[in-house]
């Protein structure tokens, strides 16, 4: 192979960028793609993403493979010699490996074309605000719309040499949650002259939990998490404002809407009870990832035939993935790729084993060539 995949992964790891800001990443990817492109390859840009069309010899279908390209707002703490050069930004979810694997598979296909057409989708903004849906709806994507699509995600808890998937629900429906409270601040000695938003927000967090525990079918599998709370600025003053940030997750798409409806009603009640103003923003919303059973079975069969990669049955997870928006319209599946890291996803010390890159390339190529 012309491409040095380990070095590419390290280069990409050093330049993590947030959603729809992946300008350096896009330029780097285009440079590598153009190094290996031949006359049977077409390239399109969409926003900060890229679409690469590899024309087959006698196409009966279009196969799509998606790799997400954005990083996270995390300060890296790996102490690696190729750690992030962008302070406060890190590839802490493995998207550097995803891109590298896609490039490796792309080069193999260019060197040894198959009958079918293959579209490689380098998608921005998976971590937020969500790039899959607008990319899916774009003219560029629709012109090359695949007949099936698949993608992978690194799994720190799985050993290198292992892949994992399942038919049906793999990832949950998710929604971001941002709630702002505004009341009246003042001196801590005169609470009766204020509207204390620390108290209001604190009680709101407690009441939120009852939406799931007492308002939804416990078999639905839903959870509301408040991961961040801000209020006040000094110990002897009552907070005029407060902010809650969190997520809503459910294995049932209808349950997400029900939670939001109940939350809106709760919010109106709190505005009356605490004589304040409350505003809510649901941010990015990701549709559940539902794997097509036929393609998952095909993938399992293909992997078992390799004799070098182990297939493992996966469990559904409450994590969110905007690839669900693509699978809502295009049949396909997603699978986990073992990378054997002591630290998990979104951890500042995540350090996937680079041996997983070749495993990922082989798994992707095995699936693409199995049609």
UniProtKB/Swiss-Prot annotation:
Function recorded in the entry: Catalyzes the conversion of N-acetyl-diaminopimelate to diaminopimelate and acetate.
One Pfam entry name: M20_dimer
The UniProt record lists the keyword Nucleotide-binding: no
GO molecular function: N-acetyldiaminopimelate deacetylase activity
Pathway assignment: Amino-acid biosynthesis; L-lysine biosynthesis via DAP pathway; LL-2,6-diaminopimelate from (S)-tetrahydrodipicolinate (acetylase route): step 3/3
Organism: Oceanobacillus iheyensis (strain DSM 14371 / CIP 107618 / JCM 11309 / KCTC 3954 / HTE831)
Family: Belongs to the peptidase M20A family. N-acetyldiaminopimelate deacetylase subfamily.
GO biological process: diaminopimelate biosynthetic process; lysine biosynthetic process via diaminopimelate
HAMAP family (UniProt xref): DapEL (MF_01692)
Keyword Hydrolase: yes
Reaction equation(s) it catalyzes: N-acetyl-(2S,6S)-2,6-diaminopimelate + H2O = (2S,6S)-2,6-diaminopimelate + acetate
Organism placement in taxonomy: Bacteria, Bacillati, Bacillota, Bacilli, Bacillales
Entry EC number(s): 3.5.1.47
Keywords recorded for this protein, A-Z: Amino-acid biosynthesis, Diaminopimelate biosynthesis, Hydrolase, Lysine biosynthesis
Name of the featured protein: N-acetyldiaminopimelate deacetylase
Active-site residues (renumbered): 68, 127 (proton acceptor)
